[in-house]
Amino acid sequence: SALKNVIYLCKLIKNVYFCNSLTTVLINRFMINRVLIRLKIIQIVYAYYQNGSKNLDSAEKELFFSLSKAYDLYNYLLMLMVALTTYAQKRIDAAKAKLASTAEELYPNMKFVENKFVSQLEVNKQLLDFVANQKRSWTNDEDFIKGLYEKIIASDIYKEYMASPDKSYETDRELWRKLYKAFIFNNEALDTLLEDQSLYWNDDKEIVDTFVLKTIKRFEEKNGANQTLLPEFKDEEDQEFARRLFRRAILNCDYYRHLISENTRNWDLDRVAFMDVIIMQCALAEILSFPNIPVSVSLNEYVEIAKVYSTIKSGSFVNGTLDGIVNQLKKEGKLTKN
């Protein structure tokens, strides 16, 4: 499909450092923020033009479905830590049940399976609500869980934790922050597994990983099962931002492309990378449709996206073209904000 093609394209050319550093700066108290919204809109707008039907309502539904799938992945990755702990407990139970169990098997070190952070996560009300409404679970991927668990228990991170007498909540939480960064964050086997489960997750993992790490850091023992997870959207304003930006980018396409063409006269627009055109089209939709967002903020966001999601020279090309358009619109009195 067109969407699959663009997600594959983005996966090939994206820069992990960019995704991690950008989201680290901008995520605070909510999962889906405007960084992710902009990226998703560019993908969906790209797919819209690659798809012959060009149905605006269907494309908008696809946008919000895609955003909701990113939030599903966030919850699913939180569940992975619980699944690994559950598997560890099963291993302990199986070893105890053997006819000739060793002393170590009969009286194992329970520190990992009794980890206070995971115990809190396991009973988290919001996560349990998610689990109750999902057919998907990690129980169908026991081979993957087994392999990941064995890598964890062979690691120095695990061994040092198990040998330490420190049983504080903070130490338990820090263990999972370290394990997540070491074994889940950049895990090709997990990436493949998730890609097989959902097309949308292929391009979301690295960004969502950052949200999960942020969540681990925010957990506090005193909050118990009521610890809040990151909400899907900050508020209705961000949902409206996504809807309005997407529709303006499509409905005002001819005007935006006219502006782009006027400011790339030394270029044949057909020879400009199509992804660059889409990025600039979305950037102009934002600059001209949202008076409260400073021009510099929009320019910086889309130039950074171009550096990662298009060609090597796209960042400077998009920056120069958009800067020229902004100056032109200001001279004509069509753009008054700074």
Write out the residue ranges for each language-model feature.
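Class I Rossmann-like S-adenosyl-L-methionine
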Residues: 24-338
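Short, positively charged and aromatic/hydrophobic N-terminal segments
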Residues: 7-11, 17-27, 41
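Hydrophobic alpha-helical membrane-insertion segments
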Residues: 1-6
